[in-house]
Amino acid sequence: MLLKLSFQSKEIKKMTQVNVILPDETDPAGEPCTVLWLFHGLHGDHNSWMQESGIKKYAKAHRIAVVMPDADRSWYADTAYGANYFSFVTKELPELCRKTFSSFSAERKYNLVGGLSMGGYGAVKAALTYPEQYAACISLSGSLDITRKNRACDLELWKSNFGFDLQSPLELEGTAHDLFALARKNCEEGKALPKTYIWCGLEDSLLPVNQEFHQLLTSLGVDHTYEESTGNHSWKWWDLHIQSGLNCLLGEK
C-alpha cells in the first residue's frame, strides 16, 4: 500500500510531502513492522525511489514499510538558512509516523536507514549520530566525505547548508557533519553501531572515498559489508543494489 502524506513541518518550516509504503498485512500477533527510512540524492525528491526503482516490490517481498521524505538539496543538515532537515528526518518525521501508523515502533531493531549519493551520506550520518535509533544502514554510492576540496557542489550551496562563514569544505573536518570523525568518536565511546551495507560502482567518481570509509570501519572493527562492482552513478545500479542491501541486512528474498 502506497500513501502520500502532506503536512506542515515545524523543523523545515514549510509544507512537505512524504511517500510511505506499508505492508499489505499487519502482523496478527501485533508485532511492529520493520521500517526503512529511505533518502534521495541531490537531484531527487520524495518521488525518486518510487519512480526510478522497484522499491515497492522489494518492500513487499521483505514485508517492510518504507518512508521516503523530501530533503531538497539540504545534504540532510540542519541548515544555516534555518530549515532543519536533519532534525526533520531523524526526529520529527519518525515521531509523526509513529503517531499515524500504529505498526511503527521506536525500538531500534525495527528501524533501518538508507539512501543513495547525498542520501547515502544522510543515512550514514543518521546512523552514526543516533546509533541507538537504527539497527542497520544502507549507503549506495554515498558521498561520504564532505570535507573534500574538490566537491562537485558549489561553495554557495555548501554555505547555505553548513554555515554562511564557511570558506572551504575542509573547515567541516572534525565536526558533527564529518562521517569519519563520527565513526571514530562512536568507537572511542564504545557505542554499538548499526550494521552497515555499503556499495559503490567501479566507474563512480565516489569510489575512492567509499574505499577509504570501508578501510576506516574495518580498522575500527565496525560490523559492515562493503561491496564494489561494475556500475556508475545511476539508477540502474542503485535499483540493483538496494536489493543487495536489503537481502544482506534482512535475509535473501
Question: Where are the language model's segments positioned?
Answer:
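Non-catalytic cap/lid and distal C-terminal segments of serine-dependent acyl enzymes
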Residues: 1-253
